[in-house]
Design a protein with these regions (language model features):
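N-terminal secretory signal peptides
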Residues: 1-8, 18
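Cap/insert and terminal regions of metallo-dependent hydrolase folds
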Residues: 2-3, 243-325
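C-terminal segment of N-terminal export signals and the immediately downstream linker at the start
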Residues: 26-58
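Metallo-beta-lactamase
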Residues: 35-36, 123, 130-131, 138, ...
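Conserved beta-strand hairpin/beta-sheet module of binuclear metal-dependent hydrolase folds
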Residues: 45-132, 237-254
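Divalent metal-coordination and catalytic microenvironments
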Residues: 53, 101, 111, 139, ...
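Active-site metal-binding loops of divalent metal-dependent hydrolases
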Residues: 61-62, 112-115, 147, 174-175, ...
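Active-site metal-binding motif and surrounding structural segment of the metallo-beta-lactamase
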Residues: 98, 119-170
């Protein structure tokens, strides 16, 4: 005869078993050993890649917050483009990247970030160098794209000394003549004269270790200046080449990726010559999109390296894949 179980009795038995399990369950839950305070800031960011026989190290000095109103365009259009790109409408948090080139013979730093003088979010370059296994006194030369603070302040210590004590500082003659000029500073509105401070600090710290160059000049084997005037009078890009492999460090040819890639005609308020900056950007974008030369940009999301391709009158940026080696 097949035994039967009263449904009410079965429910009682199961409920009782479940209750017993629940009474002992807390004792079986382990303590959460992984609990830790939130870091509250981005990790020190360093990325290496090979370029022919050269080694490129991208380093994130930090960021600077700027309002979208610096973009010289209808603000509804700006807001739409920022939203489409997944960026907050305000403020725009622009990365500040630097790039170190190891040629095998020397270490050349392309721009030096802004230290804490451009805001609390920057000034991480020294920690980046440490993470890369380097020290500031190993840097042989520093090539500055232009004399704005987010590129030049990082060459000087808070005390006014040389951040890179053994380095030669290279700045285009056109930029140095302008930003190092008390006459030009005096011409500017009083509320803009602070823009001359980065060059004055660098000149005081490096003195005769500053070696000006002419736009278009080769500065060392494998690194050549490229005339990109417009954002500043002597704004220089740098073509880095090893064998057939090359990369163009474009400095501030562009600032805001989701706006200026689809609409390269849009300038920023701090362009020295708006029309020239616009023409330079379009020319450089057209060239690198046509020949496939990778770009390295100070204000692209880290590590800031990739290729452009044309899409009608717009451009699309394809970030370079991370190299594992």
């Amino acid at each position: 005869m097949k035994p039967t179980i009263n449904p009410a009795r079965r429910s009682f038995v199961f409920a009782g078993a479940a209750g017993a399990s629940l009474t002992i369950l807390p004792a079986l839950i382990p303590t959460a050993f992984g609990k830790a305070p939130m870091a509250g800031s981005q990790a020190i960011s360093v990325h290496r890649m090979k370029l022919g026989n050269f080694e490129i190290t991208a380093m994130l000095d930090g960021y600077i917050d700027v309002p979208p109103t610096v973009l010289q365009a209808d603000q509804e259009l700006v807001k739409m483009l920022l939203t489409q790109g997944g960026w907050p409408a305000a403020p725009m948090r622009l990365p500040v990247n630097t790039f170190l080139v190891n040629t095998g013979d020397k270490l050349v730093l392309l721009d030096a970030g802004g230290a804490k003088l451009i805001g609390p979010g920057a000034g991480r370059l020294p920690q980046c160098l440490t993470a890369a296994g380097l020290t500031p006194d190993q840097i042989d030369e520093v090539y500055i794209t232009h004399c704005h603070g987010d590129h030049l302040h990082g060459t000087v210590t808070p005390e006014g000394g040389r951040m890179f004590p053994n380095a030669i500082l290279r700045i285009s003659k056109a930029d140095l003549d302008y930003w190092g000029s008390a006459v030009e500073e005096a011409k500017a509105p009083e509320n803009q004269r602070g823009r001359w401070m980065p060059a004055k600090r660098a000149i005081a710290a490096y003195g005769d270790r500053i070696k000006p160059f002419n736009l278009g000049e080769e500065l060392t084997a494998g690194i050549k200046s490229v005339d990109a005037a417009g954002h500043t009078p002597g704004h220089s890009c740098y073509m880095v080449q090893s064998g057939t492999a090359r990369m163009l460090a474009i400095g501030d040819t562009m600032h805001v990726a989701p706006v200026q890639f689809p609409r390269p005609e849009i300038t920023v308020a701090f362009d020295w010559d708006q029309a020239k900056a616009r023409a330079t950007r379009k020319s450089i974008f057209d060239t690198v999109a046509a020949d496939g030369t990778p770009i390295a940009a100070v204000h692209l999301p880290f590590p800031g390296i990739g290729r452009l391709r044309k899409n009608g009158d717009a451009f699309v940026f394809d970030a370079a894949p991370w190299q594992l080696f």
